[in-house]
Amino acid sequence: MPARASRPAPGLPARAGLGFKPEHYATLVEQPPDLGFFEIHAENYMVPGGPAHAQLAWLRERYAISVHGVGLSLGGHDPLDARLLAGHRQLQRRYAPDSISEHLAWSRHDGRYFNDLLPIVYDDAALRRVCAHIDQFQQCLGQPILLENPATYVRFEASHIDEAQFLCELVARTGCGLLLDVNNVYVSAVNHGFDARAYLARLPLAAVGEIHLAGHARQRDAHGRAVLIDSHDAPVDEAVWDLYEYTLALTGPVATLLERDGNIPPLAALLAETGRVAACLARGLALAA
């Protein structure tokens, strides 16, 4: 097993966190759970006021907050959307979140927005482009961001840089951190037939500032082959739990978010899963001691 990575100064506490859903707000107010942080999607709060901000203000008074962007299209050819950049900056000034993150993906082209996180070609031109976009975002905020590794379903013949190496280069050139989505690693490993543990060993693990866990769906392609989809609509798969424990053996305890964006159950069911996250983190802390 590779040596454990040394940890950077943390932004989020090395505890279990949960993605905030407005339908859980009343339950949260009635009985605030013992969690380290909540995560929100930035684009849902780029309005001046209303119930969403009242709820977020309540959370911010009680928990660490992670702001997770889904629409900047850091991997795209288009210039970054100035309105989204301004919205991120306003959120940062208003709430001083403990972490701000985005995806290694694209979602805009020729001024049109696509409601998905689409894969990029891993070549030198893309590396320069993504670095420039990360630099622009970080300069806007005045702080480093975390960049999330993607779940992918296709690979491009034009790619000549390994994804893990691409992420290493981005971290080295821009000073950004890594949001390590363990479910995405597993999904991509199954879809493309690579070794998930070997992939993890090639990542810049000392730069990991947050981990994501989520459920996935299993489908079949036109040829009948199994394809995993990063659906966020089911409990975390046992294989992903195993990979998460392996990851913690490499990184030590890291703030870990449970994501659930579809088929959302009552809060109690999600808190049971975050309890398992907390147990994994406690074991990781004991090993690190």
From Swiss-Prot:
SUPFAM superfamilies: Xylose isomerase-like. Signal peptide: none annotated. It holds the Pfam family MbnB_TglH_ChrH. It comes from the Bacteria. Belongs to the UPF0276 family. HAMAP family: UPF0276. This is UPF0276 protein BPP1075.
